[in-house]
Amino acid sequence: MAKRPLGLGKQKQNKKTKVESSSGEVSRESTPVASQIEVELADDVDADDELVQLKGLWQTYFDSDRDSEYVLNGIVHECDRLLREADKEGKIKELSDVFHAIYALALSELTIFKAGEEEDEKKKKEEIAQFFDNALERCSLGESDCGKSDLLDLVKAKVIIQRVPLEHMSALTVSSKSGLNLNTLVEDAKKHFKVSTKDLSLVYEVLEMFDDLLDITENFGHEEQIAEGLDSDDEEDLEPIQLDKKHPVYEMQQNLASNYKWLKEQLIALLGQLNKKDHAKLYHLTAKKIGELYLKDAEEPTNVYLSLAYDDDESKQSSKDCKESQASALKLVQNAIDYLDKAQIEDEPETWAQVAEAYIDLGNLHDNESSEQEKAYQTAETLLTKANTATHGKYDDILENLKQ
């Protein structure tokens, strides 16, 4: 990999002037110059190709902590410059879908910084909306110039999924009754989404954002309690707030189960495209997320089974429901274990412990003192002992409870 400065400094203007572009007005004071940004470029690419440089800059930002509005402004200004040059030369239609995707992604990412800048709520919302509108317009213009593109569709999905909580849900209360149906936006995002092999990391990011959106939807109205520091057990016990049917989030809450199912299906499709050797980190993250979703699916039948199994009601219907919920939960937890096992990382004990805890769940679901239960608990103990040794006693309490 060779590090080299980008060609962002081809702008010959005074730094303190402002330019107006399709992205709105951004001060040049916040825009990097060529000598101030370095990116790593692969040795087998044309380092003088400006699109290659732009891709390198975006990838540098994408792989970073993403705390630099400065770099994002640099990406947007470089996109503006390339667009102006292409327009002068009559070559706009030669700009690739990758160019338009990077432009749109940078605009949508800027909304995160804008959300924390403006104190006037109305003005802030208008500014955020403008950036999202410009990002979606860039996708549409890209498709107009380049034709149908899975990558641009994926970026559209990302922009919409990011927009729902940041622009819309953040301004709502449990008593809101606006005419906006947010579920329509969610369905639109799903319609555009596809596991594009052109950028598998972006695919995972979009799905992770969708998971976050579902979590926000599920806990809507409990934001203050969660912010005050509930532990994971208390958070799981929070009852969903009953929203009015006219509430913008109501339909999203009604569709949580189907959306979690969709999310899991897309993650499984993504995992099928990942080579464990070539995409190790992404492979482990995806497998882990799938396993966690299976565990979430298992919560309801597990609760039903444990409730019925230790209930005094011995009716035939109760016995039937007990067995059905047990079988359903066992299957889901076993599926979770299969994926969490794939997500294990050799030098990360936390991943071993996560598999162990799933085996404990599995053991709890088997008939008491059965050979299957003992086998599940023994597997959990072996993994936890290994993880506990590696972490100098981090899992002492869980191990102690397991041995009782």
Swiss-Prot record:
Q: Name the segments for region: Disordered.
A: 1-34
Q: Which InterPro entries match?
A: Nro1/ETT1
Its subcellular locations are:
Nucleus
Query: Which keywords are on file for this protein?
Result: Nucleus, Transcription, Transcription regulation, Translation regulation
Q: What is its main location?
A: nucleus
- One Gene Ontology term, aspect cellular component: nucleus
Q: Name one Pfam family in it.
A: Nro1
Q: Which GO terms describe its biological process?
A: positive regulation of SREBP signaling pathway; regulation of translation; translational termination
Per the entry, what this protein does is:
Required for correct translation termination and probably involved in regulation of hypoxic gene expression.
Q: Which family does it belong to?
A: Belongs to the ETT1 family.
* PANTHER family given in the database record: ENHANCER OF TRANSLATION TERMINATION 1
Q: Would you tell me the protein name for this molecule? A: Enhancer of translation termination 1
- What is the organism field in this record? Candida glabrata (strain ATCC 2001 / BCRC 20586 / JCM 3761 / NBRC 0622 / NRRL Y-65 / CBS 138)
